[in-house]
Amino acid sequence: IESIDIITPTESFSLDKSGEKSARNAPGWRISQVRIDDEVQTQPTIPFDIDRIATLLALLSPLYVDDIAYDLTDEEKNDIVFAGKVHFKTTDGEHTLEIGTPADLSKHPEWTFYGEGTRYVRFDNSPTIAIMAPQRIVGIFPSLIDMRSKEVWQLDSTSFSSIEIAQGNQCLRYRPVAPNV
């Protein structure tokens, strides 16, 4: 994917691989059309706000690849609750991305209700956890994405056939290589 265009009733903006977007995001916008590499995608069956749809699209895109990866200690692993799971199919098979939050937020002042700070991710059950740079995520997705019920987003794409968002409440994105590669 080279670019993503998001069109709303009032304005549109694009994301590219540099992380730049052409118009400022605003919570509450409703999506009206999505294009990936100039191809119009299947419309969602229920309305999504612009933050949520941007997050789902980012999960499918090799954007923002400046993640830092490291192996957690046993103590650190016990301190993390994996509250979200993304299951999706690509042309190279099925993958799973798990989204974690600290079990005790009082130990982690970098976390707030709105999701600012460190994210913990496990890709395909890998013991390696990726730390997401907070300014990169908060800058792109300023509000918390709350996905309390399962939702399915279908894309007419040669690279991705489907994505399923399960229980979870963190805004994250997928990159098409494991964090420890």
What are these regions (language model features)?
Residues 1-181:
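A short-motif feature that recognizes glycine-rich, charge-decorated loops
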